[in-house]
Every structure is written in structure tokens, then in C-alpha cells.
Design a protein with these regions (language model features):
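Well-ordered beta-sheet/strand-loop patches within structured domains
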Residues: 1-166
Length: 166
């Protein structure tokens, strides 16, 4: 994501402002940095921490689902719902976009006490960060396929992660 932001800033110096993204010195998010004092063509630009306010225009959409893994991958929504209509959909910066994420969240939390769908919409409409924890662990398995059969027809896709040889 940092690379995407840095590239965008080199094209449009107002990118951060337009997208409600703020720069901080470190992960504690205490000291805000003015973007006009950063040389976006240097390695220094990669050292800062970026934060976008929650809400429907956030690049991760309205929800992010963290799960333990060594690659820092997470599941997330998107404000660009039309991307789900595309045949080739590897637009994310390495994480997994989830279509109808509210349905997934409701399913994940369905066994939790005092949980209901109206509570989810109340949380999402609030545009603030809210951490929810599952009562029990649910395994997540992610497969990477470049060939499969669909309706009797073999399908091939580009090996964007260069994993077919491994």
C-alpha cells in the first residue's frame, strides 16, 4: 500500500488530502507529518506510517478482518464494488478483497452473544474504528489457483505471484 501512496503522491501532490489519508512518524500515530515537507522521490517517504480514516470511502472499504499469518495478509471490503464484476481481479496490494463482507461478518459473529445484523449496520454507519473478537477460532484457508475446471471448461489465469514453478 505504501508504494501505491508514494506513486500517487508523485502524480498528484494532493492525493493524501483528497483521500483523507494522514502521515505519522510511527505506529503510535501521535505525531502528524505535513506531506509537503516530504520528498516523495526518496527512500525516506517509505519510512512514515499512513492512516486513512474509517468509512465508506476508505480504500479498505468499511471492514477489515485480521487473522494470524506470516504474510500480514487480511480480508477487507472495498469502496470500488464494481471490481467484483471484472474477470481479472488482482487489484489489491496483496490482501484479499471480500464481496459482501457484511454477510461474512454476520456469519463469523452469528454465534456471539448479543450479535445481530442491525448491530453490524449501526457499527458500519458510525464511521469509527471498532474491534470485534470472535468467541472461537475459525480456520481460514486461502488457495492460489491458476488453472481449474468451471462448467466443464478448463480455465487458466496468469501466475501473477510466480508460484506455479514451486
Amino acid at each position: 500500500m505504501k508504494k501505491d501512496i508514494i506513486k500517487a503522491m508523485n502524480i498528484d501532490p494532493k492525493y493524501l488530502e483528497k483521500n483523507n489519508i494522514f502521515i505519522y512518524q510511527d505506529y503510535y500515530y501521535q505525531k502528524k507529518i505535513n506531506p509537503q515537507y516530504i520528498d516523495w522521490t526518496t527512500e525516506e517517504a517509505t519510512l512514515f506510517k499512513f492512516r486513512q480514516n474509517p468509512g465508506y470511502t476508505n480504500s479498505l472499504g468499511v471492514a477489515k478482518i485480521n487473522f494470524p499469518n506470516k504474510h500480514a495478509v487480511y480480508l477487507h471490503d472495498t469502496p470500488k464494488k464494481s471490481l467484483f464484476n471484472e474477470e481479472i481481479r488482482f487489484f489489491s496490494s496483496g490482501c484479499v478483497r471480500v464481496q459482501n463482507i457484511d454477510d461474512l461478518i454476520n456469519w463469523l459473529l452469528s454465534d456471539s452473544a448479543n450479535w445481530n445484523e442491525s448491530l453490524l449496520h449501526e457499527i458500519l454507519d458510525n464511521s469509527s474504528t471498532k474491534t470485534l473478537r470472535l468467541d472461537s477460532k475459525i480456520p481460514i484457508k486461502i488457495g492460489y489457483l491458476t488453472a481449474w475446471v468451471e462448467n466443464g471448461q478448463i480455465q487458466f489465469r496468469d501466475d501473477i505471484y510466480k508460484k506455479d514453478a514451486t
